[in-house]
């Protein structure tokens, strides 16, 4: 017998369903549920008098690896927001990996069940929650280990970068130089409940030192201007990368000492490269580093301190730059260096290039002119600002499927495509760029269950739960001495997944294939799940989800004005942002 229920009551009980819209935090962004995997009337929910009880929604089936056994964990009635869609579903987790996205329950009493709940199944309530893939930050200065706590509390589950601690080289550049430092950082990684990978230093005109670092366990190489990003170093680094299937990241030559942007592009020789600081102020060829956005072999990323362009951005950046790059405000040349790097015109253009999908990746530049805990937050602030200033975003026609959803989105008044474009910038696209998308970066079957649960009102600001390799690793938790878990003070605290042997069983360390073949993980006694990066050299910008546009770029060297496909890119700084004062005391 059917029982009618109105949408409001249904959403309160089981979360939104097809046709319902959800506001992301306090932004002007609205997403709409595109599909619901449930069978109406057969939804599963845990609690007193609810469905997941023996003989009802819970079966007597044991846990196991195959499709006909129960899952270890089920997230019920979750609203999934990912690059591939915005759907309502149950999520089944087995052995720390995403087993199935579909309908959970008891196959003995319910139809259309593909996620079996049994006595050995834990339940995480996803009703009224948005679930996203754990964020990936590929621009980490490993200056202090406390960054990892901040990252996890913000929803980041993978950190890629370089460094050895608060050394001068690390505070300025993202390199872990030499095999000894690489080995020590790999051993240190075992202590942290997060996925990690380290760049070797890529600045040399001879290949031997680069090969040594790759074989030691670097997952990639980093070229940084402070070490000399010359055309010779670029060419050598990319040549070695092609031999070993690892990615190269580059911070180009701000001062144009070793060559101009055209010389750097020529040194690329059409080989794929991940360009850091493809932006308005963070570094790289002044003033025209944004030119690289037009090339299909360039995977462009920007960092979060300029995101989005506000009335405070320029002033803040000058002070940050002087500290990060050891500049002296009493030396005129140092001041000129700072002024050339902080340009309002190119910062404004950076906003729009993100909205066009021409800048494909968002990252932090942690403690080196960027904030590790604000990658997600500032991505969505940028999306909000662009909706206010540029209006509804029409989707590009997908180059692989040729699917155009613009009519659907515009008629329904949702921001689904803009949401997919922006979430891809810190999830699947950095994973593709660094050869780890087969493990992480999206909510897809077979990938590591690195997931974040958000209350919609706190989306992008403060996650409710962070799941790492299928286990809760960080969560909003109240007073441990209270009679229940919710009394104040409630804040993000480490959970059981962040301790002991659970860390190694749920976290990955990414290295080169060469290091795997040389058995470096075994020699170092690593306890985490170690995996090689792959397919970093046979990709292009076209492989990056929803962020693959390559407009013809022109930057005026005197006025710093930016054009894309003949259109002047300019926008006003804002004085008020969402996801800001409303959520934080300081």
Swiss-Prot record:
It catalyses: urea + 2 H2O + H(+) = hydrogencarbonate + 2 NH4(+). Coiled coil: none annotated. Ni(2+) 2 binds at residues 222, 251, 277. GO terms for biological process: urea catabolic process. InterPro entries: Amidohydro-rel, Metal-dep_hydrolase_composite, Metal_Hydrolase, Urease_alpha_N_dom, Urease_alpha_subunit, Urease_AS, Urease_asu, Urease_asu_c. Its cofactor is Ni cation. CDD domains: Urease_alpha. Keywords: Cytoplasm, Hydrolase, Metal-binding, Nickel. NCBIfam families: PRK13207.1, urease_alph. HAMAP family: Urease_alpha. Belongs to the metallo-dependent hydrolases superfamily. Urease alpha subunit family. This is Urease subunit alpha. The gene is ureC.
